[in-house]
Amino acid sequence: MSQSDRQKITNKIKEVLFADERIVFAYVFGSFLNSPSYRDIDAGIYLDKIARKDVFDGELEISKKISEACELPIDLIDIKILNFAPGHFLNNVFKNGAVLFSKNEKLLSKIIEETSLNAIANEYFAYQSLKELVPK
């Protein structure tokens, strides 16, 4: 798929997600961004309010909207709600993804900062644990 076609799809995804008042910010990430071939289109969204029990249904609902708007099979759309995502996943999205939009820059900056600080702290502990496990 050409870069131009990818940009058209990305713009359509942005349009669909931005129209949803619940979505505070959105990212696209994964192989769709830079790889010549890709398996699916990954997008991460942060909602102003969602219960943990509603995450799967929310991801499916938004995937369907994007699938219809982009005229792509739903199995090509992989939406992840980021509200309860583990830190290492968030760190990867923020580091390697591309922001589509943010309706609240202050909140986005706060989450990125917290995720980065946690990653740094966890890196130290992981390194210390590894040193204890690996014989000299």
Give names to the regions the model predicted.
Residues 44-48:
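Short hydrophobic/aromatic beta-strand micro-patches
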Residues 1-25, 33-38, 52-136:
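Catalytic core of pol beta-like nucleotidyltransferases
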Residues 40-42:
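Histidine-centered divalent-metal-coordination microenvironment in nucleic-acid enzymes
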